[in-house]
Curated annotation (Swiss-Prot):
InterPro entries for the chain: F-box-like_dom_sf, F-box_AtFBL13-like, F-box_dom, FBD, FBL60-like, LRR_FXL15/At3g58940/PEG3-like
Superkingdom field: Eukaryota
A Pfam family: F-box
Organism of derivation: Arabidopsis thaliana
UniProt protein name: Putative F-box protein At3g44060
Entry-linked Gene3D superfamilies: 1.20.1280.50
Signal peptide: none
């Protein structure tokens, strides 16, 4: 590596945790100060119950690394550690130091060593004119925001198990982020209201189980184009104000304790109605199970849908996929995962998935193909019933060796097709 220019070596050091970057200083005289030119500081010390000497060593290392920066700009500051109550002032000092250096990316993964939810986020985090990316976690409490809360440049925000009081998440925090475009929230409890006019990409994962069943989630985010939503079925469907929504990934799952009272009262139909105008829809395997249980009366039309990503066990292939295909007259791209799960017993003859005769599907993609005879029959059925098909992409399982992949490719190329334009790609 000695033949590489200094600027390239600094870029390589940027990708390393700070402790490893500093360790390169002993390699040679040339390397002695290279690490000080990196504008990325990444401190990872998740060990709990540390002896005092090790704790002091870590704290001194962070202090000295910040001191090395002098008056230079810090692009990225990451801190992953468990803390004690008496360490709050130390943490405040580090964060203030990073902010004073004009940090643009701040990633804090902090947890109180004894009492989760006890530690409050330092108020200095909420007033910065330079922050563009901010990550906060995990199991932290934010009782209030400072009166001068302002993050005018913030574009990307990740909140991992952050507890806010009342509606301060939207009314104060998000309101102070006028440039925010990408919001990710992972939480054990429902944030009741998420409101922002600027967000374009929203990822929301909730794992509240039975105790969150009564919450009503409201998304007032009219500029969101791309939504990822992971949750359990609820008594009350979420209320969406998503005028610009084009892409949705649904990851619904049954409550882990299998409380039938909650599940029987869940409202999934209204959730599906809220997203029926999207152009791209991704349904996970567990989502298909949930929809199959709660939407037996039918589905709305998906007139704008052009791309569907679908994964399921046996029931979903037999019932839900045909219904989705029937209700999506403008579908052009179909991506199928776990097709090998749709099998038939020895005493049952093969029955292909019903394909609407007027379908407009142009691209078919089969994921994790292993070459089973049943899946090959399904693929053959698709090719004979998709007249507009132009491209079929088959992703073979990574575990297959090259001779097996060649055999699978030959088998696929021999299949008869209804479309004269079809090109088959084995990936």
């Amino acid at each position: 590596m000695d033949c590489l220019p200094d600027d390239l070596l600094v870029q390589i050091l940027y990708l390393l945790p700070t402790k490893e970057a500093v360790s390169t200083s002993v390699l040679s005289k040339r390397w002695r100060t290279l690490f000080t030119r990196s504008d990325n500081l990444d401190f990872h010390d998740p060990i709990s119950g540390r002896p005092e000497d090790i704790l002091k060593s870590f704290n001194d290392f962070v202090d000295s690394s910040l001191a090395f920066q002098g008056g230079k700009h810090i692009k990225k500051f990451s801190l992953h550690t468990k803390i004690k109550t008496f360490e709050y002032h130390v943490l405040d000092r580090w964060i203030c130091n990073a902010l004073e250096h004009g940090v643009s990316e701040l990633h804090l993964h902090l947890m109180h060593e004894s009492w989760p939810w006890l530690f409050s986020i330092p108020s200095k985090v909420f007033n910065s004119s330079t922050l563009v990316k901010l990550s906060l976690g995990s199991r932290l409490y934010c009782p209030s925001f400072p009166p001068d809360t302002s993050l005018p440049a913030l574009k990307v925000l990740l909140l991992d198990s952050i507890l806010f009081r009342d509606d301060q998440l939207s009314n104060v925090f998000l309101a102070a982020c006028p440039a925010l475009e990408d919001l990710t929230i992972h939480h054990t409890y429902h944030p009741c209201v998420i409101s922002s006019k600027s967000i374009k990409k929203l990822s929301l994962s909730v794992n509240s189980g039975y105790y969150g069943a009564g919450y009503i989630l409201t998304l007032d985010t009219p500029s969101v184009v791309d939504l990822y939503y992971s949750d359990s079925p609820r008594h009350n469907a979420p209320l969406f104000h998503l005028d610009s929504l084009a892409k949705v990934t649904l990851d619904l799952h049954f409550i882990e304790n299998n409380n039938r009272e909650v599940q029987n009262d869940a409202d999934v139909k209204n959730l599906i109605r809220e997203i029926c105008n999207v152009k791209t829809l991704h349904l996970t395997c567990s989502t298909v199970e949930v929809i199959s249980v709660y939407c037996k009366g039918g589905l709305p039309m998906f007139n704008n849908l052009v791309e569907l990503v679908f994964s399921s066990k046996k029931e979903g292939w037999r019932v839900l996929l045909p219904l989705l295909l029937e209700n999506s007259p403008n579908l052009e791209t179909l991506v199928l995962s776990d097709l090998h799960r749709y099998t038939f017993g020895r005493r049952h003859r093969f029955v292909g998935i019903p394909i609407p005769p007027n379908n407009q599907i142009k691209v078919l993609r089969i994921m994790q193909y292993q070459g089973s005879a049943t899946v090959l029959k399904h693929i053959s059925h698709f090719l004979l019933n998709m007249d507009c098909l132009e491209v079929m992409k088959v992703n073979v399982a990574a575990a297959l060796d090259d001779p097996k992949k060649m055999q699978l490719t030959e088998d696929l190329l021999k299949l008869p097709t209804a479309s004269c334009k079809l090109k088959i790609q084995v990936l």
